[in-house]
């Protein structure tokens, strides 16, 4: 192994065990307050906050360090309107016949339908694209690895960073998502992963009265 390609890891920060325990408790308490919001305020968000959160997302691990993601940040009202119109067109098809009954029954407790006003009301839409393959300076294809896993991890970090900054989020996945690549002018090598809606919750925002699984329901120790 070529040692010249490695540098000493100097950024690790150590904490006493007691402080580690408290930090884990504090983080748990904070992240447990995170909820998906569908009613957003039109109150503006400083762009620098969004930029810092995107930089956090960019630290995500990825297959072979390819970093196969692109974040299109939309705040322009006309572009948001185009995205809403295209999304609602697909969602109308979904709710009126494309989706199987079992899927619709699973969605019923969440109160969702084809109407997506949040796509215009929220100050920011972050459209996340995955790169099926990269391109070099000459336009030659570069193979990417573990693309869905890599983009999913980056998205999770972004959601956490936005929550930590005091913003609410909504993951929106109209199907199909092809219209996003056209509206936002992305390349043929990219696939829309999801729309992350973010901003402040409205003063009248509500959330479904649902419960998360208990630890023992999703964890095994060996």
Question: What positions do the PLM features span?
Answer:
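Short, basic and Ser/Thr-rich N-terminal targeting/leader segments
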Residues: 65-69, 120-122, 191
